[in-house]
Regions:
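Phosphate/pyrophosphate-binding catalytic cores of soluble transferases and nucleic-acid-acting enzymes
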Residues: 2-8, 12-13, 20-333
């Protein structure tokens, strides 16, 4: 899907004078802003039912799915990411699945460019793009004006070494002094984000928050959030993890080892994969690995909810409601 999306995007498509946001949106969509084709987003926590809703919406709207799950971007990481099989996609075109090797470090800036190319391609063919996933930063990077500062390998390597030697708490305190607002938004345990924030501050001389998304939309969009009662979601997570192991997660991980999974800074830390590696290495029993995956996923769900609930443009629907599809369709019309 990625190759098709990129090959069909015409050179210069989507470029327009930068001094007029309305003109830019109208130009990219080739129609006046008020009636511009919209991107439909389906977001929410893990296991809430986003994928099922997106397939149903795609059938009703003539839509195509653009993946916004950061782990489903990785080739061969299928079972542990709950990636839909070809049959489960029911003929709905999906973009940005299986595009990165497991050794590739997650790069929001690269994802942004690829996702916008895919969305522009879908719009150019008169279809509806459905941006679907639980990676909040990836979604915002696509939907909003968000320019990424450059990187410096030497600065990044030095900060990552400091992270190893000093721990995330010390670097988080340094971030708090340099950019209190960013420190409030980044968990003290999130070493990768802390390192990136400090790198941006050092390279630009500006607060990291200056690089965060602005509320100015890049695309007109309808944002649908899918969630469930916590007890219901907890049960679904536990069942999903159990089914992951039954479906052959360990075999999937073993097959990825020769491809460099252990060296993948992002992929090797993915929920389920990190624990499966520990089981393979004898550091955890299977029961311990599964229990740790459940706990980690529930913690991740809390972070997802915290991120998405701050966005007032998302309309929330109950994933367990029998009228979920009808309610979602009503929002798109």
């Amino acid at each position: 899907m990625l190759s098709r999306a990129l090959s069909q995007v015409q050179p210069g498509y989507g470029e327009a004078p930068a001094d007029d946001r309305v003109q830019t949106l109208a130009y990219r969509c080739s129609v006046p802003f008020a009636g511009a084709p919209r991107v439909i987003t389906v977001v929410g926590p893990t296991a809430a039912g986003k994928s099922a809703l997106s397939i149903a919406l795609a059938h009703e709207t003539g839509g195509e799915v653009v993946n916004a799950d950061s782990m489903q971007l990785y080739r061969g990481m299928d079972i542990g990411t709950a990636k839909l099989t070809s049959d489960e996609r029911e003929g709905v075109p999906h973009h940005l699945l299986d595009i990165w090797d497991v050794t590739f470090p997650a790069a929001v800036a690269e994802y942004q460019a690829l996702a916008r190319a895919a969305i522009d391609d879908v719009l150019a063919r008169g279809k509806t793009p459905l941006l679907v996933g639980g990676s909040g930063l990836y979604v915002r990077a696509v939907l909003e004006e968000f320019e990424f500062p450059g990187t410096d390998p030497a600065v990044r390597a030095r900060l990552e070494q400091e992270l190893v030697s000093s721990g995330p708490a010390e670097l988080h305190e340094r971030l708090r002094v340099s950019d209190p607002v960013a420190a409030e938004k980044i968990l003290p345990s999130n070493g990768r984000r802390i390192v990136r924030a400090l790198e941006v501050i050092e390279l630009t001389g500006q607060p990291f928050t200056a690089a965060l998304p602005s509320p100015t939309p890049y695309y007109p969009s309808v944002q649908i959030g899918v969630d469930r009662a916590t007890d219901d979601l907890d049960e679904r997570i536990a069942l999903r993890v159990d089914l992951m192991w039954q479906a052959g997660l360990l075999e999937e991980v073993r097959a990825l080892l020769p491809l460099g999974l252990r060296d993948g800074r992002t992929a090797s830390r993915a929920l389920g994969y990190q624990q499966a590696l520990a089981e393979i290495d004898g550091d955890m029993t299977q029961d311990e690995a599964k229990a740790d995956t459940v706990r980690g996923t529930r913690r991740f769900v809390r972070r997802q909810r915290s991120w998405f609930r701050r966005d007032p443009s998302i309309t929330w629907l109950d994933g367990a409601s029998p009228t979920l599809l009808a309610d979602a369709l009503a929002l798109t019309r």
